[in-house]
């Protein structure tokens, strides 16, 4: 397996035009494959809904962002990791279950993790994962 595990913070920054690094990370992932846990789709939909509700995006911009997200060459890991693994990672590295899912996928696939979440990046480094862009 090649590519990168991308969390919602990177995809959201790319879709909302908030960070130039996000575009680079998305491009890197598109070359080798973007891997995400199933919850990524829920988180990203929520980001777009909140941005629309807070008027950071117009309805047309939100539809465009949704189409861009849907067009990403994303490989979704359909089976969530066992609860015990998420719980153990969350406890050991002080993560939410959501962030633990990204870390677990990066560790299991032995792929770098792309994130703008400082706490998740710190935890991933402690767990032995590589951070994309480091």
Go through the PLM ranges and name each one.
Residues 24-25, 44, 86, 124:
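Hydrophobic packing residues within well-ordered alpha-helices of enzyme cores
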Residues 1-39, 51-64, 127:
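Short, well-structured N-terminal submotif of metal-dependent ribonuclease cores
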Residues 1-3, 103-134:
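Acidic, PIN/NYN-like endoribonuclease modules and their adjacent C-terminal/linker elements
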Residues 41-45, 83, 120-121:
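Alpha-helix N-cap/helix-start and coil->helix boundary motif
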Residues 39-42, 98:
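Aromatic- and histidine-enriched alpha-helix N-cap/loop-to-helix transition segments
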Residues 10-11, 40, 102, 119-120:
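Alpha-helix capping/helix-boundary segments
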Residues 45-73, 85:
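Active-site-proximal, substrate-binding regions of enzyme catalytic domains
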Residues 71-119:
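Active-site neighborhoods of divalent-metal-dependent phosphate/nucleic-acid chemistry enzymes
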